C-alpha cells in the first residue's frame, strides 16, 4: 500500500510502530529477543518495509545514537533509561536528502512515550 502511494507522491509515515528494529533500539535486546516488539519476524518485516523504499529518519541521521522513545511504567524504567525506540518517522527514500532534523524529545514527560520530530526541507 505504501509503495502504491509513493508512486504518486512521497510518503511520510509517523507513529508508534511497536517494533524495535535493531538491537541498538532497546536497552535489553538479549532478554527481549522473543518478546512482542522485538521478535525476529517483526524485525524482518520492518526491514522489508525499509527495503521497499523507505528510510528510518532518526537512524539515518543518528546511526549510532542510543535514544529511546518509550519506557514501561513498571520498574522505574524511564528513570533507569531502560527503554525502546518504537516511535518513528519513515519517509520515502526520495525524501532522504531533504531530511534536516529527526529527533526524539526525551526531556518531555506526560506519557510512557515521548515526542518524535521530523523537519524536512520544502521543495520551493
Where are the model-predicted features located?
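Metal-dependent phosphoesterases centered on the DNase I-like endonuclease/exonuclease/phosphatase
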Residues: 1-82, 86
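Short, charged/polar surface micro-motifs in flexible loops or helix N-caps
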Residues: 55, 95-96
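Short active-site-adjacent structural elements
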Residues: 65-68, 98-99, 112
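Short proline/glycine-enriched turn/loop segments at secondary-structure junctions
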Residues: 77-79, 105-110
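Short hydrophobic/aromatic beta-strand or adjacent loop that forms the aromatic wall/cage
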Residues: 85-87, 113-117
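Hydrophobic alpha-helical positions that pack around
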Residues: 90
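Low-complexity, intrinsically disordered Gly/Pro/Thr-rich segments
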Residues: 97-107
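Short, basic, low-complexity termini and linkers enriched in Ser/Thr/Gly/Pro
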Residues: 121-124
Amino acid at each position: 500500500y505504501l509503495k502504491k502511494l509513493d508512486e504518486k507522491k512521497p510518503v511520510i509515515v509517523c507513529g508508534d510502530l511497536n517494533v524495535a528494529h535493531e538491537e541498538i533500539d532497546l536497552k535489553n535486546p538479549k532478554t527481549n529477543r522473543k518478546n512482542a516488539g522485538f521478535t525476529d519476524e517483526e524485525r524482518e518485516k520492518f526491514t522489508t518495509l525499509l527495503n521497499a523504499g523507505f528510510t528510518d529518519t532518526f537512524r539515518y541521521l543518528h546511526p549510532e545514537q542510543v535514544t529511546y522513545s518509550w519506557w514501561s511504567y513498571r520498574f522505574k524504567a524511564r528513570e533507569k533509561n531502560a527503554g525502546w525506540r518504537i516511535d518513528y518517522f519513515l519517509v520515502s527514500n526520495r525524501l532522504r536528502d531533504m531530511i534536516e532534523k529527526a529527533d526524539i524529545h526525551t526531556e518531555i514527560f506526560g506519557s510512557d512515550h515521548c515526542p518524535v520530530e521530523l523537519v524536512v526541507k520544502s521543495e520551493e
